């Protein structure tokens, strides 16, 4: 006969290794600590592990937490520490880091560099030419505020990413788009905060792949490996490529949960990893500063999302990577905390709400000091 007490013992045994010793590869340089030593409630984290496996949450893949630079919690509901996670657009943020590095190295003159000036072959084949296209900058693409008629959140948009995927030349497809309108039924729209009109455009971020290759002389996947991934001890990645074999910088890059956590921690450290300044602190600050308004609660930096998360009576400003399915890598400077939540709950109506609930009701609620 199955006894409830035995079920409880099994559950406790299953959950206890979450903050114990974990297998590490020679490239995984995380230092581990107990949650309690880092000011987190182990009781609350155990409750989170139970809840994440309940019917209240769908297809959660992993949950990891770093506090004060140490890995204090990891839980794998799908796969393990070596599983490469399909976090979709969350990895757009990697493109921000690579652009910052190219600027730091003098390969790019800065965020005001004109995109079509860097891609003269593309400019010569341009359809729907317009002075506003030739004035389009790297910053316009980093902030989802280019003049192109491209909106992934609008099925009718000519630049919707699903239309891009069915053609061979993604970059030319995007650059050939007409200029988007900002008038509705003859009514003027008030200038937005920060002076930029936000329109979520994966294709614009993909164009940065060619911009980076032109500037650095290296294909983006090779540049990322040498300049970003190896310094962080990241050795196992999986890129998506366009039909012309150009790395997709607009999302789809697969990394392990621990390696995603490293990217969040890199920015939490002001661009430093160990003794090495991987990307300048100035770039980190500018990337995570608001440049465009998405809605009344959310701003956008350079391919980073910005909003405050509330736990109880407290509100914590955060910047985060975000992707379809509810995938998130969240940094909360006030708490010196970074969290990774991966999920395969793709295209579900409440995909982001459920990962936000894990963050607010459990991770932030676990903070005791």
Where is each model-derived feature located?
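Bacterial N-terminal signal peptides
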Residues: 7-17
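Active-site SXXK
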Residues: 46, 69, 86-112, 141, ...
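A short, well-structured edge-of-sheet supersecondary motif
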Residues: 50-80, 336-340
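Short, small/polar residue-rich loop motifs at catalytic or cofactor-binding pockets
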Residues: 57-60, 83-84, 324-326
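Short, well-structured active-site flanking segments
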Residues: 74, 101-121, 216-240, 274-281
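Active-site-adjacent helix/loop patches that line small-molecule binding or acyl-intermediate pockets
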Residues: 117, 128-234, 257-266, 271
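Active-site Gly/Thr loop motif
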Residues: 234-237, 284-338
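Structured C-terminal helix/loop/strand segments within mature extracytoplasmic catalytic/sensor domains
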Residues: 321-369
């Amino acid at each position: 006969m199955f006894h409830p007490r035995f079920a409880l013992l099994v559950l406790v045994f299953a959950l206890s290794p979450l903050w114990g010793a974990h297998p590490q590869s020679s490239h995984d340089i995380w230092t581990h600590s107990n949650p309690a030593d880092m000011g987190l409630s182990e009781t609350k984290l155990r409750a989170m592990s139970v809840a994440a496996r309940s019917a209240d949450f769908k297809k959660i893949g992993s949950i990891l937490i770093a506090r004060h630079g140490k890995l204090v919690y990891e839980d794998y509901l799908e796969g393990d520490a070596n599983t490469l996670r399909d976090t979709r657009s969350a990895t757009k943020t990697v493109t921000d880091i690579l652009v910052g590095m190219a600027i730091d190295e003098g390969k790019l003159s800065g965020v005001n560099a004109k995109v079509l000036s860097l891609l003269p072959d593309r400019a010569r084949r341009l359809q729907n030419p317009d002075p506003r296209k030739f004035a389009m900058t790297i910053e316009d693409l980093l902030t989802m505020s280019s003049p192109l008629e491209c909106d992934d959140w609008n099925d009718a948009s000519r630049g919707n990413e699903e239309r891009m995927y069915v053609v061979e030349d993604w970059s030319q497809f995007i650059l050939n788009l007409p200029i988007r309108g900002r008038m509705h039924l003859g009514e003027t729209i008030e200038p937005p905060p920060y002076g930029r009109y936000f329109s979520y455009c994966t294709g614009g971020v993909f164009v940065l792949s060619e911009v980076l290759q032109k500037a650095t002389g290296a294909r983006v996947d090779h540049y990322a490996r040498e300049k970003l991934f190896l310094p962080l001890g990241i050795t196992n990645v999986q890129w998506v490529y366009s039909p012309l074999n150009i790395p997709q910088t607009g999302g789809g890059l697969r990394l392990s949960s621990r390696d995603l956590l490293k990217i969040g921690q890199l920015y939490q450290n002001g661009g430093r990893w160990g003794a090495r300044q991987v990307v300048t602190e100035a770039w980190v600050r500018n990337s995570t500063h608001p440049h465009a308004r998405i809605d009344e609660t959310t701003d956008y930096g350079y391919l980073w999302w910005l909003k405050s998360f509330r736990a109880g009576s407290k509100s914590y400003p955060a910047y985060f990577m975000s992707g379809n399915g509810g995938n998130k890598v969240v940094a909360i400077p006030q708490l010196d905390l970074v969290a990774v939540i991966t999920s395969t709950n793709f295209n579900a109506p409440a995909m982001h709400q459920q990962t936000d609930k894990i963050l607010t009701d459990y991770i932030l609620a676990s903070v005791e000091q």
